[in-house]
Amino acid sequence: MTELVTKKLVIQEEQVRGPWHEAWSSFKKSKSALVGSGIVAFFVLIAIIGPFIVPQGINEQNLTLRLQPPSAEFWFGTDDLGRDVLSRIVHGASISLTVGLSAVLISAIVGSFLGIIAGYYGRIVDTIISRIFDIMLAFPSILLAIAVVSILGPSLQNALIAIAIVNIPSFGRLIRSRVLSIKEEEYIHAARAIGMKNKRILWKHILPNSMTPVIVQGTLSIATAIIEAAALGFLGLGAEAPQPEWGKMLADARMFLLNAPWAMIFPGIAIMLTVIGFNLMGDGLRDAFDPKMKN
């Protein structure tokens, strides 16, 4: 009798635990995902509280201390204008994370909207939107971003817009394929049969069941967006002086690589660690939400 009650309780517990709970349990078991989450959390914390605790001002120049190696006073050394590299990296974290998160949020919203419309309504709407995505994906993302910034003009804001635009097709095609699968489910046909309007079907059934791949793709896309922002900054098409954006810091320090490698190495390490963190976290989310893709 006791064994039957125990089995019944186990079955009831499994029924209560939804897919989000299962995904979270799987995510916590992944060491690489936890490491990635820890790295991301560290840089987010640095971006929030770092500017209040750094020892030097980001634009505080002292030419008598230019190109100083790492020391007790300047942990990461100084750049060609005598500015503290550590302080600028800390302030740059908020810039890079803001650009990455904002660009991905914009591209996810726009791309998801277009993907849902294309996948659900099909026909000429699907053809037009899909062809636009194909044309955009025919170009390397960084090349397309450079073209957009060249039209809008070099600035951090325009770089953010360019990065958002070039990432729209990846979200759009992902959601479109998801919607094509979902709209053939029986509960969608049942909703149509009882007279439910398309807008309600999209909002109540299609959209909630399409969010899982968006979350995974969004996490991975943040890493790509940070790299693209750094690349645009390095090329002089993103952040402008004296903004301490990591890519801009690399560009300013490249002329002094042999004499002061620390001015270029430390911003590069910051970019690398942030990208690795988001990639590991994204891989963990993908494995948690879709265990079939783990191998």
Question: What do these predicted ranges mean?
Answer:
Residues 148-151, 163, 178-179, 228-270:
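Glycine-rich helix-loop "coupling/hinge" segments at transmembrane-helix boundaries
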Residues 75, 85, 109-111, 116-182, ...:
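Generic hydrophobic transmembrane alpha-helix motif, especially the helices
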Residues 1-112, 116, 123-124, 138, ...:
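Gly/Trp-centered helix-boundary motif
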Residues 210-213, 277:
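Conserved ATP-binding N-box helix of the HATPase_c
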Residues 43, 116, 145-150, 159, ...:
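Transmembrane alpha-helix boundary and packing residues in multipass membrane permease domains
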Residues 187-194, 202:
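Helix-loop-helix units of permease transmembrane domains in multi-pass membrane transporters
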